[in-house]
């Protein structure tokens, strides 16, 4: 029997388990009670293609993952990141979940096709604005943003010219 769990339900369950056991509660983790040192960083990590969705919004260009996942037979069930977890539209809620779970950091990657839709040339400011708003919200909630500059998400047009190493 296969049971499908929605991301928010899974996260809520994990947070509940951690907080009910005191693992993430300030009385344990923040004071370094011997389980974890006081300076231990509790965080979460995501990959832009796996969570953002909104692949055709705000002038985002096609990425190598768009090309790969839309090629028949490459991904089980033909799944794509077209919608994914819809983080692009639900990032406020996602940051609130991190904050309510007493995390202290969030590591995220950039979708370069959202910033440089064609791999070179003009910067798409709506892409930068998205990440700017995300960082502002993280800081406002007391979460330390950790930016991963590259996690295998490249504009397809740049890949067709040889990737990062092209002239």
Tell me the role of every PLM-derived stretch.
Residues 2-3, 83, 123, 165:
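Pocket-edge positions in alpha/beta enzyme catalytic cores
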Residues 46-65:
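Short, solvent-exposed beta-strand-terminating loops
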Residues 62-97:
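Aromatic- and Gly/Pro-rich amphipathic surface segment
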């Amino acid at each position: 029997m296969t049971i499908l769990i929605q991301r928010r339900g899974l996260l809520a369950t994990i947070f509940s388990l951690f907080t009910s056991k005191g693992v993430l509660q300030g009385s344990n983790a923040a004071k370094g009670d011997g389980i974890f040192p006081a300076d231990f960083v509790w965080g979460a990590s995501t990959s832009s293609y796996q969570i953002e969705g909104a692949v055709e919004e705000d002038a985002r260009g096609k990425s190598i993952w768009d090309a790969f996942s839309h090629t028949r037979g490459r991904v089980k069930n033909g799944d794509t990141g077209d919608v994914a977890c819809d983080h692009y539209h639900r990032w406020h809620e996602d940051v609130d979940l991190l904050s309510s779970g007493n995390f202290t950091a969030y590591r995220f990657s950039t979708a370069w096709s959202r910033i440089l839709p064609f791999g070179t040339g003009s910067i798409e400011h709506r892409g930068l604005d998205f990440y700017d708003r995300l960082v502002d919200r993280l800081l406002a909630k007391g979460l330390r943003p950790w930016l991963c500059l590259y996690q295998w998400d490249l504009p397809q047009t740049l890949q067709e010219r040889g990737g990062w190493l092209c002239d």
